[in-house]
Amino acid sequence: MKSFLKSLRTRYAFYRQCYLDAKRFRDSISPGKLGPAAAVARIEGDIVRQYHVIEKGLTMPDFRPGFGKDMVRGLVRSMRALEKHPCAARCDSGQLGAARATLREYHERHAALGHDISEILPDNCRDLWENATPGDGGSRPFTPVASGDADAFERVVRSRASVRSFDAARTPSRETIMAAVDLAMRSPSVCNRQTARIHVFTGEDAQRALSFQSGNRGFGHRIPMVIIVTSDLRYFTGTAERYQGWIDGGMFSMLLLLALHAQGLGAVSLNWSVNNERDRELRNAVAIPEYERVIMLIGCGFPSPDGLVPVSSRRLATDVASWGK
């Protein structure tokens, strides 16, 4: 009987955590759960998703005139909805500019072919693209990486290691961190929605954040800066994307770690594999919004000159790769 009750309690705890994960996702993507200021993120997410689908169509090797008509019309509706929204000023102007430039290229490509798209993109929508800056969105030529750049990238990747010995007297500048974040924003994301967010803490705030993470014992007190990576769930749609925050946030985090290393900083990945109760404690302590999913923590700083790092032996590529017939 004791074994049965223990099994029952374990199952209950498991399903409860799954339910709380699902509830956060559901509440974050449900328009009725969002206030006016937060709901504009949903419109922005629709705009990004729609213009990026059109961008992909513009890059297809066999251009098909009139492609994506439903997506183009949807983008126009979303942009008009944003114009009427009381919190429209909160929308990322860069993403809106990309949408305008994409519509402009779509119009110009068809005009050059003499293909009539007035039923898809009528003249009364001209204000949406006529002042767009070419190159802000749409398509561009692809530039392969030069061999020297590939060698430099390999050196960055192979030399990166998890640093746990920091110079506690030095804290990275905001400019250095933002330069790394700017590079990390080049990471892939579903339909280019770019849901990754960061929360940066130093001093006592960094130590407060670390107190909720169990993997920094013995060195956490020497970490001068903590970066919490999250994913903004408001930009996702439907249950099929319920794991996308972790996927996109993970890719962003990896590129951020490489970028920090390239900036001459040391960093250590601190996992956030916790239950929702511990997650709640961190959120309350450092004010992370309910609609953001915590992906991981990163301890960051200048590496100690005499510090050591683990060898961390890696599997061979041949051990993990399989090739289809």
Predicted region positions:
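Acidic, surface-exposed loops and disordered segments
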Residues: 1-325
